[in-house]
């Protein structure tokens, strides 16, 4: 199985994977220029994610190892999510009574999203998990698993 692991300073002990650490590569924020749709379809003007895009779209499974900050994803992960836009077409379709970007590719990977816990209430955790599930639903992932990091095997904190 072709797997990509996207992490925030949490090492993953896995074989046959492509590992992308958001703490090692500075992901620039989307500047909203629309070049990924109009000038260079499918390619962002910032090129630090080019290799990741290839591995991401060809993977069967993506595993996220994320840190929760103040009850939400980090700014690094949010910038990463925003920069996934080149993987979709600049058109909108109505699917299940909601607007979604049209997929650029015929296949999108399944997602396992594991997070370090930092919630004061169960309701905060529920809102967070629903946000992550909705994000990957919009990213056309068919199988979406969202769980605390303690539920994931073979990870260790990087000092």
Enumerate the language-model features and the residues they cover:
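Mid-chain, well-packed structural core segment of small domains
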Residues: 89-92, 103
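Short, conserved loop/helix-junction motifs that constitute active-site signature segments
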Residues: 101-109
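Alpha-helical scaffolding within the catalytic cores
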Residues: 96-100
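Short histidine/acidic/glycine/proline-rich micro-motifs that form metal-
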Residues: 68-70, 117-122
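Glycine-rich phosphate/pyrophosphate-binding loop and the adjoining helix
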Residues: 120-159
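N-terminal beta1-alpha1-beta2 submodule of the flavodoxin-like/Rossmannoid cofactor-binding fold
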Residues: 1-89, 137, 145-146, 155-157
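Short hydrophobic beta-strand segments
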Residues: 3-6, 110-119
